[in-house]
Structure formats: structure tokens, C-alpha cells
Amino acid sequence: MRASVVIPCYRPDANFEKMLGDLNAQTCQDFDVVLADDGNTPPLAARIEATLNRPHRVIRFDQNRGIVAGLNACIAAVSAPVVIRMDADDRMPPDRIARQLTFLDNHPDVDVVGASMAVFGSGLRMWTKPASHHDICASLLWAPSLNHPTVAARTKVLQGHPYEEGHHLAEDYALWLTLAQEGVTFANNPFCAVYYRMEGQNTSQNGPQAKLKRYVSMHQFAIQTLLPHADAAELTPGLTNGAHQVLAGMCALRDPNSPGLEKVKHHSEALLCALEAHGERHPEDAWIQAAQHATRTRLARVEANTRWHKLEGVLNPVSYTHLTLPTKA
């Protein structure tokens, strides 16, 4: 087998069978499937056997252990050279696996590749991320630069770097930061690999206070990981103080006349000042250069009354190819 599709499953709804049908319909058939039945009652074996006609393995947990445990168990069981991520209630086009395997074949230097995804529920939006390794690494200061459900990766990379507990609902972001620090090479292939379902996502875990807490925590973790020489006391207070403003401004970015844009701008300007001060003391730190460029780019987008999330794929990230960032040994 050329690849294994790994799928953590917890309380999948009626769309589960549709997702399995998408696996059956793939134009590339040289793959198997590893599913984690994460304490579901009744077990999922009957539903899987009735629908999935691909070689597969089900790892059964007697009780719910969470997505990190499910992903790690699935990945540990993979023997194929490539791991492909999928969620239990999402959909994918029939050429997804073929296109991602072809990309990895044609780019042997790339370890992890993501793609765009169409997000649907109350509407339809396209989430597109930066394409090049340098752009992805620079953008990691602000947010995850790969759409997690779209990722395909070399098995040896993921088996050597399991997902970590302790980053609730941000386990992918933490992993990308760790891999970036170690010189793993990223890419995004900008085709739509997944139709991502947002329905049923509005739990208490996604409320404003929970989002704020995760935002501050992961933003600080990003700085500590990507900028190991940074003075945490210097950089993180601005992040903490500005987090409420940034959170309030996220939705406001849809409206170019919203005062939320000004709040995001002020926070970005404060962070940029701190980054520039750090860069003057550590001119050898390539990550700080990337962070400064990413922050200036974000400011330019805000000042142009554009959204920073790159929805609809209309925003082109600035190039960072002139920077010297960590590479694999």
C-alpha cells in the first residue's frame, strides 16, 4: 500500500457512511484505512463493515480517550509510507488521495503537505493557506498554516513526533510548531482536498472565553517555539493584553467599516514593535525576521480592509524565500 488514511471516530453521525463512500470512490485505490473507534456505543464495526470496501483496521477503545489518543494509535499502526488525515464526518473529492500522493512523489523534499478545504454548514467558504515552506513557517507565529483535515505526511515524520496531549483543540498547531523547529519541510497544494463540516461544532469548548484562552496559550507557545531567544516577559504581555481585542476583531474583519479592524491593527503594531526590538538584539535569528515580515503583511491586509484568514483564496501571502530558516540535517 502507498498510503494509509487515518480516521479518529467519536460519535459519528449519518455522514459517517458518506465519508466511507468517498473512500470507496477514490481514483487511487492503493491505500488502506485505519480507524479509531473512540469508545462509541454501540461499536462502529458493523457500520464500517457494511459500507467500506477498502482494506481496513479498526482500533477499539473501550472508553472515549480523545482525538490525540485516536490519531496516535492509528498512526502507530501504519506501515505504508504516507499517512493521510480524514475526519469521520467530512467529505472529499475522488481524486484527493491520488493528487496528494502525486505531489509527494514529485516533491521528495516535502514531509508534510496540506491543501485547501471548503467549509460548509451555514454557508460555504474556502480556506486556503500559504503554499511555500517559508510562508508556512512565518505564518505559524499567528495561526496554524495547514488545514489539519487535509494533511498528508511521511509516516516516519508523524511516527517520530506523536501528537501531544495538553493542547486541547490545538493539537495540530502544536505539532506544526514542533516540526518547524526541527526543520521538517512543509507545503500546501492549493486544491480543495476536503469538504469540512462545521455543523455541530458550536460547543462550550468553542465559546468566546475558551477561544480566548486557547489563542493566548498557543500564541505564546508559538513565540517560545519559533523564537527561542525571545524575552517572554517582553513579548507575551502584549499578546495577552491584545488577545481580547484580536478575538473581538476576528468576526469584525468581515466588515471593512468595523472598529474591530482598528483593534487588530493596534495589537499587530504593538507586537511588531516588540519583534523589531528583539531583532535588533538578535540579528542572526531568522525566525524573528520571518515573524516581522508576517506581522507587517498582516498589518497591510488590515489596513487594506481585507480579511487575514485568506477566505476565498483571494489573498496571496508575501514570499519569504530570501530568509534562511531551519532545514533538515
Named regions from a protein language model:
Residues 37-46, 63, 87:
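A conserved acidic beta->alpha catalytic loop
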Residues 320-327:
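Conserved small/polar residues in nucleotide/adenosyl-binding loops
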Residues 97-126:
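Conserved donor NDP-sugar-binding/catalytic core segment of glycosyltransferases
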Residues 134-218, 229-238:
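Conserved nucleotide-sugar donor-binding catalytic segment
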Residues 21-30:
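Short, acidic, metal-binding catalytic loop of nucleotide-sugar glycosyltransferases
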